[in-house]
């Protein structure tokens, strides 16, 4: 089964907790702090495996949770870092955030890796907080929570050649006779509803990968007939082979078919207009094909390649394969990892956005309580051990140093008012 799009949930591992411990050794009366740091939590990493061709594995498992780092130990021994969770994906996989629709990774080459959810760092043990004023601190840090997010995996096939055209023009039949692929073939529209790949070898021993893409119809660039799902696979082909029913057996005009499909390609991605294209005039064994072909060529520019074939009688198939192989040799390698944002008119690579750590916001709940939120303060909250009074006092000092106390006063917060951070509730004290 071919699966080219799926939504999954990721949870990176939390960092291990640091611990509060002291050196207890005979004849060492003031041994000092000896609490070790926690280990780093495992990250969720995606890696390209060129042996994969589909996202089928993610259809049956949608939730992935990486391991937590080990807690620190006494004698200043650090906890072990957790081993990253590596998820294998096929070449051509794009990973997007469900929340922001931002591209987090674009994986093209075999072995290429991307960290999508980072594991939390380990909490610090009490020996890390020793100072001349406080040589034996009696608090430590909890591990940092690992990142958690939902992502969409989208597969854009990496094929040398993409077959496009209206339904029932002979794309699947062509793939079946030039490769060992076994696509479903039927005398009705949309027999092919998922792309099929085949390795093609020419009589002069050149080879390339050909993708049989589901049939397109007018309006495909707007999503008609699942057009977006089909068109995205065209983006990463080096050469487009445009198949046309030159007999007009479906009651359509071959020239109109050609113009409609090309317009849909351009509407979907403007840069597809410049992609090398070979026109295959199929069904030349049927009546009216020769006359239609002559009229068709008269309407085209001289530099457009048109190859007449019959996938039923197999006439001129070898010549078509030679033409495709020659065209591929002319085409330079295309860097598919850089996507062009046509709305902005610039080339850019999108990386994951890391929010500013210092900003925070203050709002009011319905009951009048003040709610403080922000990446840095929430991270500190999660890493504070609220069972330890010294750790709580340290958290209060951090809030003051960030300017949160002053900001609360400016918002009208006074002695005894309730302040909330995530699931915690505090009383404001002047």
Swiss-Prot record:
Residues 159-329 form the OBG-type G domain. It comes from the Bacteria. This is GTPase Obg. It is an enzyme of class 3 (hydrolase). Residues 352-430 form the OCT domain. It comes from Staphylococcus epidermidis (strain ATCC 12228 / FDA PCI 1200). Residues 1-158 form the Obg domain. The keyword Phosphoprotein does not apply. Monomer.
